[in-house]
Regions:
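Catalytic active-site module of serine/aspartate enzymes centered on a nucleophile-bearing elbow/loop
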Residues: 214-252
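Active-site loop/turn elements of alpha/beta-hydrolase fold enzymes
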Residues: 45-48, 109, 221
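Conserved loop-alpha-helix segment in the C-terminal half of the alpha/beta-hydrolase fold
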Residues: 32, 188-222, 228
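Active-site loop/oxyanion-hole signature of alpha/beta-hydrolase fold enzymes
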Residues: 29-32, 41-81, 236
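Gly/Ala-rich beta-loop-alpha elbow adjacent to hydrolase catalytic centers
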Residues: 82-86, 90
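Conserved HGGG/HGGXW glycine-rich cap/lid loop of the alpha/beta-hydrolase fold
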Residues: 2-52
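Conserved alpha/beta-hydrolase catalytic His-Asp/Glu region
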Residues: 115-116, 133-184
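Flexible "cap/lid" loop of the alpha/beta hydrolase fold
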Residues: 91-96, 101-131
């Protein structure tokens, strides 16, 4: 079941796509703030949450998001907001169906998982695959309780962690080029990274050069999970980006 807010058909749709291991519940803070003005959809990606029985592939995930936009988005179009794994899926959707995507915001996804960059993806997959699930689940729960307030952590716990699906997803990303896909999307894009996300920040300029109409944003005092570390700042960026798109398209 895809979580959604507001049935007002005049409100632009935003589809939020979560990161590896998490679920659509990772966007609870953004939906709470943005649901007043936007129709928000927070699907679980294949291999995760309610879709954990569906094997993850980049193309398969993109096709499911495209089908969701066709089925649920107002006017059959949406702004895509993706973090990490969700950012890569969002890029894939925008490249294949640009007419369905009015804007593209990606966070922590400005590196092609190839060559040396692929080592980080492979390494995390190995850890999640080899460490017993009860152990890694305990570590994740400890981390989220320590790092985030209950208003953020508890919905994530309720949505569940999908470690096996995360392993498959990480390995599916390896060897895939996403900057050319970003270049194929002619619409506006917003590239977001956390100040302390030193894995994705160095290659952000290359992604910005590839994008047709890019904007860049750095979220201070944030790591890779920028929407959770600084939820208010992240939400303000998305509201401003989405509002600008609506204004430029003649939609208030």
């Amino acid at each position: 079941v895809d979580r959604a807010t507001t049935e007002d058909a005049t409100r632009p749709t935003i589809v939020f796509l979560h990161g590896t291991v998490l679920s659509g519940a990772a966007w609870t803070a953004q939906v709470a703030v943005l649901g007043d003005a936007f129709h928000c959809l927070t699907p679980d990606l294949p291999g995760h949450g309610t879709a954990q029985d569906i094997p993850f592939t980049v193309d398969g995930a993109a096709e499911r998001v495209h089908a969701l936009i066709e089925r649920e988005a107002h006017d059959g179009r949406a702004i895509l907001v993706g973090l990490s794994l969700g950012g890569y899926v969002a890029i894939a959707v925008a490249a294949r169906w640009p007419e369905r995507v009015t804007g593209l915001a990606i966070a922590g996804a400005t590196a092609d998982p190839v060559g040396l960059q692929a080592l980080g993806f492979r390494g995390l997959a190995v850890v999640l695959d080899r460490v017993p699930e009860p152990v890694v689940d305990g570590v994740y729960r400890w981390f989220f309780r320590l790092r985030f307030p209950p208003s953020i952590a508890e919905p994530i716990f309720a949505g569940g962690f999908s470690f096996a699906g995360g392993v498959v997803a990480l390995r599916a990303l390896v060897g895939e080029w996403f900057s050319p896909r970003l270049a194929a999307y002619p619409g506006p894009s917003l590239l977001i990274n956390g100040e302390y996300d030193l894995f994705f920040r160095p290659t952000e300029p290359a992604f910005a050069r590839a994008a047709a109409d890019p904007r860049r944003a750095l979220i201070r005092r944030a790591t890779h999970l920028s929407n959770l570390d600084q939820p208010d700042r992240f939400s303000r960026l998305i509201r401003a980006f989405a509002t600008r798109i609506g204004t430029n398209s003649g939609r208030a």
